[in-house]
Swiss-Prot record:
Keywords: Cytoplasm, Initiation factor, Protein biosynthesis. It is found in: Cytoplasm. It comes from the Eukaryota. Component of the eukaryotic translation initiation factor 3 (eIF-3) complex. GO terms for cellular component: eukaryotic 43S preinitiation complex; eukaryotic 48S preinitiation complex; eukaryotic translation initiation factor 3 complex. HAMAP family: eIF3h. This is Eukaryotic translation initiation factor 3 subunit H. CDD domains: MPN_eIF3h (cd08065).
Length: 336
């Protein structure tokens, strides 16, 4: 997972000091190339460092480089990053660390390692962002690059280090306000724009038949399977929390019963003129059970919400294609 090797400032509540992110076309192409190459291998996610600089309220990403594969234990990740930035500095390339990037599947990037990594980045470099590239959606023709930062509530949650229901309730933290999306724009030089205009004229025009492709069952099936897995995981977390609540209730009942019995015994002792026994021993017998952390259920809920949104959007697009196909088929039959 992404790591920071530079000196870290003390954790503090970080406001969003960046209005938007400006990414050079070369850096975007390098991220896309790396993520697609890793998606074809056995690597679950592709990760890398973002280099650039901050100008006023704009974060400029001018270059990037991939992190070494985690399966290679012979490479020191922090030393690798330092050597890369040192060599880039020698060739007059922006070498300031401004964040990191990661690939995602169908936009569902929310995970515990990502939260921890972005927390360390953002408390070390206040303006840092994480750029998420959706490989599956981009394969279908939609370039998806999004930049995110942790919200002040999420920073405060990690700073306190408590993920109990009461702590999350007091901080008003939910899966919908863990991250704040920062607008991202891709900038090319004037020569690149001229070349792209010339290439656009050289590319043959598509007939448009691929837009009516109805082979969408596999995509929808993968979405549903992933969401079912997340629902099962959330159900297991709910069962753990229910068992914890039942344990607390049962312990309180036993404690109340023993205290009542002890009060009767003390009343009898006082009636006999003896000294009452304190309740400290009984209180020590009933230690409160460990509260299960609620961060993982919070993340799983966010993943379910993401899958549900994608399924809803995908189904609406598929229905539109079906209606278009029905209209075209009817027009064809009328001509015949």
């Amino acid at each position: 997972m992404a790591s920071r090797s530079q000196n870290r400032r003390p954790a503090q509540e970080v406001d969003n000091t960046i209005s938007y992110v400006q990414c050079d076309g070369l850096a975007a192409m390098k991220m896309v190339k790396h993520c697609h190459e890793e998606s074809l291998s056995n690597m679950e996610v592709a990760q890398g460092a973002l280099l650039g600089l901050v100008v006023d309220d704009r974060l400029e990403i001018t270059n990037c480089f991939p992190f070494p594969k985690s399966s290679d234990e012979t490479i020191d990740e922090e030393e690798y990053q330092l050597n890369m930035m040192r060599r880039l500095r020698l060739v007059n390339v922006d070498h300031f660390h401004v964040g990191w990037y990661q690939s995602a599947d169908v936009g569902n990037f929310l995970s515990l390692p990502l939260l921890e990594s972005q927390y360390h980045y953002q408390t070390s470099i206040e303006e840092s962002v994480v750029v998420i590239y959706d490989t599956q959606k981009s394969k279908r023709g939609f370039l998806t690059l999004k930049a995110y930062r942790l919200t002040p509530q999420a920073i405060a949650m990690y700073k306190e280090g408590e993920f109990t229901p009461e702590a999350l309730r007091n901080l008003k933290v939910g899966y919908e306000n863990l991250f704040l999306e920062v607008p991202i724009v891709i900038k090319n030089s004037a020569l690149c724009n001229i070349m792209m205009s010339e290439l656009a004229e050289m590319v043959p025009e598509e007939e448009g038949t691929h837009f009516l492709d109805l082979g969408t069952a596999s995509v929808l099936e993968n979405h549903l399977r992933s969401m079912m897995d997340r629902v099962d995981e959330l159900n297991q977390e709910a069962n753990k929390f229910n068992k914890y609540q039942q344990t607390v209730i049962r312990q309180e009942q036993d404690k109340h019963r023993m205290l009542a019995k002890h009060a009767q015994e003390n009343a009898a002792r006082i009636a006999k003129g003896e000294t009452a026994i304190p309740d400290d021993e009984i209180t020590k017998l009933f230690r409160p059970p460990t509260v299960p952390p609620r961060l993982n259920p919070l993340i799983v809920s966010g993943q379910i919400n993401t899958y549900a949104k994608h399924i809803s959007q995908f189904c609406s697009q598929s229905l539109a294609k079906l209606y278009m196909t029905q209209a075209l088929q009817g027009a064809k039959e009328n001509k015949q």
